[in-house]
Amino acid sequence: MTQSVPAIFLDRDGTVNVDHGYVHEIDNFQFIDGVIDACRELKEMGFALVLVTNQSGIARGMFTEEQFLSLTEWMDWSLADRGVDLDGIYFCPHHPDGSVAEFSETCECRKPLPGMLLQAQNELNIDMAASYMVGDKIEDMQAALAANIGTKVLVRTGKPVTAEGEAAADWVLNSLADLPKAIKARYK
């Protein structure tokens, strides 16, 4: 059996890109400063990069799954063009109060539940204890806890950081851009 690898699990909106609210078009997608360089450095450090994102706008009828997939393909290519290959992309299109019947449900994949993270663990052979979850909301931290991810990192680039969010996180950083330096400092 191949050796498991550590991963950086990344929330999307507010962590990788500026959260303009239900981002689903290329014209509205803006990488947060320093994120691409940080992702490249994290890959060089031996981490798998795994995107895990709730996309309730699909269930709410704000955009289609096809629109989301088109934007995701563009984002993936944009990162690859800059030397960053994502190892996995997982998304939850569901919401219990959705207006699109096929996606209006309570599921196991929507954060704070750990479904997407556990699916990635199984498919990519991830060492969860050596991994990091990076997100801008308490739900990201709760999903990481439920999936037994070693380090929960809350970033200030998205939703306002709450006391509950800080308490649920192991680290609070200004941005994903600060993560490589923080990890290196941990192992000095």
Swiss-Prot record:
Pathway: Nucleotide-sugar biosynthesis; ADP-L-glycero-beta-D-manno-heptose biosynthesis; ADP-L-glycero-beta-D-manno-heptose from D-glycero-beta-D-manno-heptose 7-phosphate: step 2/4; Bacterial outer membrane biogenesis; LPS core biosynthesis. The keyword DNA-binding does not apply. The active site is at D11, D13. Zn(2+) binds at C92, H94, C107, C109. GO terms for biological process: ADP-L-glycero-beta-D-manno-heptose biosynthetic process; lipopolysaccharide core region biosynthetic process. The record marks T53, K111 as: Stabilizes the phosphoryl group. It is an enzyme of class 3 (hydrolase). Pfam families: Hydrolase_like. InterPro entries: HAD-like_sf, HAD-SF_hydro_IIIA, HAD_sf, Heptose_bisP_phosphatase, Histidinol-phos. GO terms for cellular component: cytoplasm. Its cofactor is Mg(2+); Zn(2+). Substrate binds at D11, R12, D13, D19, H20, G21, Y22, T53, N54, Q55, S56, R110, K111, K137. It is found in: Cytoplasm. GO terms for molecular function: D-glycero-beta-D-manno-heptose 1,7-bisphosphate 7-phosphatase activity; magnesium ion binding; zinc ion binding. It catalyses: D-glycero-beta-D-manno-heptose 1,7-bisphosphate + H2O = D-glycero-beta-D-manno-heptose 1-phosphate + phosphate. The record marks R110 as: Contributes to substrate recognition. Keywords: Carbohydrate metabolism, Cytoplasm, Hydrolase, Lipopolysaccharide biosynthesis, Magnesium, Metal-binding, Zinc. Its EC number is 3.1.3.82. Mg(2+) binds at D11, D13, D136, K137. It comes from the Bacteria. Its main location: cytoplasm. Monomer. Belongs to the GmhB family. This is D-glycero-beta-D-manno-heptose-1,7-bisphosphate 7-phosphatase. It comes from Yersinia pestis. The lineage of its organism: Bacteria, Pseudomonadati, Pseudomonadota, Gammaproteobacteria, Enterobacterales. The gene is gmhB.
